[in-house]
A protein has these predicted regions:
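Sec-dependent signal peptide recognition
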Residues: 2-9
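Hydrophobic h-region of N-terminal signal peptides that target proteins for export
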Residues: 11-20
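Active-site-adjacent "subsite" loops/lids of carbohydrate-active enzymes
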Residues: 31-33, 39, 43-55, 115, ...
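Solvent-exposed loop/turn segments at secondary-structure junctions
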Residues: 40-44, 78-82, 130-134, 196-198, ...
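Aromatic- and glycine-enriched glycan-recognition loops and surfaces
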Residues: 48-67, 94-120, 173, 228-239
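Catalytic domains of carbohydrate-active enzymes, especially glycoside hydrolases
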Residues: 55-82, 184-189
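Aromatic-lined carbohydrate-binding/catalytic grooves of carbohydrate-active enzymes
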Residues: 69-104
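Polysaccharide-binding and catalytic clefts of secreted carbohydrate-active enzymes
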Residues: 70, 77, 120, 142-144, ...
Length: 279
């Protein structure tokens, strides 16, 4: 269950019709991609006893399989944390209720979901949020969180904290996380949500003046420079994944149709057509 022929793909959530009866026989083309997201940030996992949560996930997979879904995009890294046994980041508060607290009894949700998906001939896509660290400043970070070791890598924007996308150290850390995932887990793809700079807050500029002064040589404006920073991360992730696994795909999430790429580039700072052409 790999996507060896694709380096990048646009992942579409099939929001409509997931409860419909799946066509019988070979009604679907062999390579048609029919995916559904299972997210963690809505709180559906938090504090649920392990066996009950496993039963819930199995029930969701059975329903989605019956609806014809053949790929699951499962959120494993919402806030530079982990819904898996990470070697580099703390357990997610969206699993146990407290960041850094191990599940009890110990289990690995990503490994469990990989096994259950593959039993059903479904692809498993590991969904990460690369830059986001805090969705609210009120949230507490675990003592082992990378933020405490390297606060200079991060910026506060509005009520949230992010890796500074301009810093080589930020990119290296994100690539290290992805390398760990693809080398230890049988994932079929890495799926990136919020791969771009944060959506603008009216009247508040993203606080990267110091980074622009340090790394912005050769760019006449921040917009082009920020696009370049995102492009560098995508290229490095591509190289990381191909170097470690040789076959996994990279997906990215859009909230606008592809025909609006030029406009969305100005807003979310991504150049998808460039990635397709060059990587």
């Amino acid at each position: 269950m790999t996507l060896k022929n694709y380096l990048f793909l646009l992942v579409l959530l099939l929001a409509a019709g997931v409860r419909a009866q799946a066509p019988s026989g070979n009604a679907y083309p062999k390579r048609e991609f029919r995916a559904a997201w299972i997210q963690a940030v809505n709180g559906q996992f938090r504090g649920i006893p392990t066996e009950k949560l496993k039963q819930t996930l199995v029930g969701q997979l059975n329903s989605l399989q019956g609806a014809g879904i053949n790929a699951i995009i499962f959120q494993v890294r919402p806030e530079a944390d982990a819904l898996y046994a990470s070697q580099h980041e703390p357990w997610s508060r969206f699993l146990t209720g407290t960041q850094g607290q191990m599940p009890s009894p110990m289990w690995d949700p990503m490994q469990f979901m990989i096994e259950e998906c593959h039993k059903r001939n479904m692809e498993f896509h590991a969904w990460i949020n690369p830059y986001r660290v805090k969705t609210s400043l009120k949230n507490q970070l675990a003592p082992t969180h990378i933020y405490h070791e390297h606060p200079e890598w991060f910026v506060t924007y509005g009520d949230q904290i992010y890796f500074d996308p301009a810093l080589p150290e930020s990119r290296e850390h994100i690539c290290k996380i992805v390398s760990d995932i693809v080398s230890r887990y049988d994932v079929d793809a890495i799926h990136m949500d919020d791969y771009f700079y944060p959506y603008p807050i009216k009247g508040v500029d993203f606080p990267d003046n110091a980074s622009f002064a340090r790394y912005g040589g050769g760019f006449s404006n921040k917009a082009d420079w920020r696009r370049g920073n995102v492009n560098i991360l995508i290229k490095k992730l591509h190289e990381t994944i191909r170097g470690r696994s040789g076959h996994q795909a990279v997906g990215e999430v859009r909230n606008q149709p592809v025909r609006y790429l030029p406009q969305s580039e100005n807003r979310s700072v991504g150049q998808q057509h460039k990635w397709f052409a060059e990587l």
